[in-house]
Design a protein with these regions (language model features):
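A short beta-strand element within beta-rich, extracytoplasmic domains
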Residues: 35-45
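Extended, low-complexity, turn-rich repeat/linker tracts enriched in Gly/Pro/Ser/Thr and Asp/Glu
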Residues: 43-51, 102-107
Length: 115
């Protein structure tokens, strides 16, 4: 079991991307440390793009998940604006921020899973 503040999993999920794409997933489970409790993602650079937040437990089949916008408090499965987003990830294996539509801009998503 993790001790709060002892370890975090940091991933650049999308890096100045100018197209649709799956990006890199953020692992919510570490063999040495167990499950992380929360994942927080920072989205920057959106101009005309949509990010769909998704997760899986089998490493293959992705399902849209609700994330909380930490600025507005609103929960949604997508965003079209920059911001900080959080989701409880206990029990999930991976989370991704898929760019599901894109017209312009260079979108970056950075994620960290922590206990």
């Amino acid at each position: 079991m993790q001790v709060p503040g002892s370890y975090g999993n940091y991933v650049k999920m999308q890096s100045a991307v100018s197209a649709t794409g799956d990006g890199t997933s953020l692992a919510c489970f570490d063999v040495s440390f167990g499950y992380f409790n929360f994942a927080t993602m920072q989205v920057t650079g959106i101009t005309t793009a949509t990010i769909t937040f998704e997760a899986n437990i089998d490493g293959t089949n992705w399902v849209a998940i609700l994330v909380k916008n930490l600025n507005t408090g609103v929960e949604a499965t997508t965003t079209t604006a920059d911001g900080l987003f959080r989701v409880q990830c206990t029990g999930l294996m991976n989370i991704r921020a898929r760019i599901s539509s894109w017209s312009s801009g260079a979108t970056t998503v950075t994620g960290i899973a922590t206990s």
